[in-house]
Structures are given as C-alpha cells and as structure tokens.
Amino acid sequence: MKYFCDLHIHSKYSRGTSKNITIENLSKYAKIKGLHILGTGDFTHPEWFSQLKEKLEEKEEKGVYYLKKQDTQNKLLNYCDTQTTEEETRETGFIFQTEISLMYSDAVKSRKIHIVILSPNIPVTEEINKYFSSKGRMDY
C-alpha cells in the first residue's frame, strides 16, 4: 500500500500558524486532502504534547498513533458523502514529530539549520523532551 504523508507540520503553538489547529482538525483536513499519515508537529511544546498524549493512542502499527475517539472520524464521513469508500473511512495516522532550529553565526552573518525529528513512540518522545528541556525553554 502507498501512503501519502506530511511529516513536517506545526501546531497552533508555533509562530505564524492558525490558532484553530487541533489534532481533530488535522485529522479531518488530512482526510480531505488524501493524506494517510501526518506528523504531530511540535511535540517539544509541553501543552501540545500533553494534548497529543491525551487524544492519541497506538494501535496495531507500531509508531503510528490514531485519535482515541472514532466519533471524530465518523463526523467527517457525514460531511463527505452518504456513499463512502474504504479510503474515506480510514483513520488518519500520526507520527510524533517536531522541528528544532540550530542557530549559529559565522564571520559574515547568522545562519539556521532546521532539523525534523521523528519519534517512534511516547516513551522515546518523553526522553527527547527531557533532554531538550535541560538545554533551554520548550514552551515557544
């Protein structure tokens, strides 16, 4: 099976993003756009990570998380059409993902390197967050 994924997104806690971003809305619009799996975005942000842990659960696929409540997925089906295909009834998967920015200055100007980090599960994500929290602020 082919998967269409977007593994580099941001949460509502990032600069320049919609304040309407929720995990439910991400799932809804991923389905409309034909995406199977999304990155969670910004798992290093404490409030967002707390919401992710509350609302997502790992199922049979290791490392892929889904909304705990099937009701949210079913509401979208009513939005689409009364005759739905198997593709329309599938759940949106999520992989824990964040981006970090490494900044430095050379003799001429400042530079940034952006790194996307994917994490296989909640315990590893918690370890990553613990490490980064020892290096600086995590709430922005």
Language model regions located:
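Domain-core and long-helix interface of multi-subunit machines
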Residues: M1-T22, Y131-Y140
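Extended substrate/RNA-proximal surfaces in nucleic-acid metabolism proteins
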Residues: K2, S50-Y140
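Active-site neighborhood of phospho(di)ester-bond hydrolases with catalytic His/Asp-centered motifs
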Residues: D6-L7, L38-D42, I95-Q97
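Catalytic metal-binding/acid-base residues of hydrolase active sites
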Residues: H10, T44, E99-S101
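Histidine/acidic-residue-rich catalytic or RNA/ligand-binding cores of hydrolases
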Residues: R15-S18, F49-K53
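Short Gly/charged-rich anion-binding patches and loops
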Residues: N25
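Divalent metal-dependent hydrolysis catalytic cores, especially in the metallo-beta-lactamase
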Residues: K28-F49
